[in-house]
Amino acid sequence: FYQFFASFEFLEKQYFVSMFAYTLELLEKNETYHSYTSADKLSAFYFTFFEMATANRSFVIHLLKEDKNPMKNLGKLSKLREVYLEYALTILEKPIKIEQETVVKIQDKVLQEASWLQFLSIFNFWMNDESPNFEKTDVFIEKSVKASFDLAYNIPTQSVIDFGKFLWKEQMNGMFSKS
């Protein structure tokens, strides 16, 4: 065991990295994936990742709710965050073409972190989703990706309002109050 992992905590972190790697492996096997838009690539990633998470749902939820301290549980995603941010940088297009290197780095960081926050919000929604076949998580993914890309790359449109209505409805149904 110690030849591969320094601790059980590291093993838990590596579990999520392995899920990430397998998700990308599955996506890479899809011949059309490389021709997808950034939004479609991100959606495909989320759908595939959460399909895999669903296959191991009890274990994943156990890992992320094991400790009473939510920050300690979130720490189990630290290695996943590292690889996810690299992935996000490769697929997300810059909304504004800027020549100044410092500003480009800031823009890249903002895009990466916003994408990570979106991923965490989907993760949290999925953990609390009690709908059949986690259909509401699928809707959450669709609406949040559409709204975030509209906000970043276009003038916010109906998708932002649509996503807001969905969130409001789920808040009223108690989806976000569970933890």
Residue spans for each PLM region:
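C-terminal peripheral helix-coil segments that are non-catalytic and often amphipathic
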Residues: 128-179
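Short acidic alpha-helical/loop segments enriched in Asp/Glu that coordinate divalent cations
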Residues: 60-75, 102-103
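Amphipathic alpha-helical packing segments from all-alpha helical-bundle domains
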Residues: 73-97, 109-121
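Helical hydrophobic small-molecule/effector-binding pocket
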Residues: 40-64, 79-93
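Short glycine/serine- and small hydrophobic-enriched flexible loop segments
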Residues: 121-128
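An amphipathic alpha-helix adjacent to DNA-recognition modules
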Residues: 2-28, 32, 43-50
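All-alpha amphipathic helical-bundle segments outside canonical DNA-binding/catalytic cores
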Residues: 98-114, 134-139
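Hydrophobic/aromatic residues within well-ordered alpha-helical segments
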Residues: 15, 19, 23, 45, ...
